[in-house]
Amino acid sequence: MSNTGDAVSQLLGIRASGPLPLMSAVEQGLPLASLDRVVGLVSPSDRKFALRIVARATLARRRKAFATAKNAAEGRLSAEEGTRLTRLASVWAMAIEVWGETEAARRFMFEQHPMLDGRRPIDVVLDNELGRPLVEGILGRLQYCSAV
């Protein structure tokens, strides 16, 4: 299974061919449209889901700055926020690859999992960088029919 920077870039709606250009895009600040795009795919019915990635006041300030076009840089995610969003997009791409469709991938991400001590994969991925390989490991095992 490959979870290339290309698949993640496509989910983010940016042009970055490979992991290094993707890293550069994250460091320079992903556009708010990337946040909206991934949130719309992962959790379309939860209007507050974006707040798991960007604080409410920060997001409101950035949207206002972007809308008024005073400062286009203010309408971008910080490197930390972009990293969190990219981590989510990467795991989401893998979940789609394993499950083959969005609803099954969404169920996996939002339901408690016994291999995560009853935590939801979405929470494990967003709460800490160390959670990403745990969830990717489960997805890898599922792909090869060896997960419980």
Feature annotation, model-predicted:
Residues 1-148:
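Non-transmembrane "mature" sequence context
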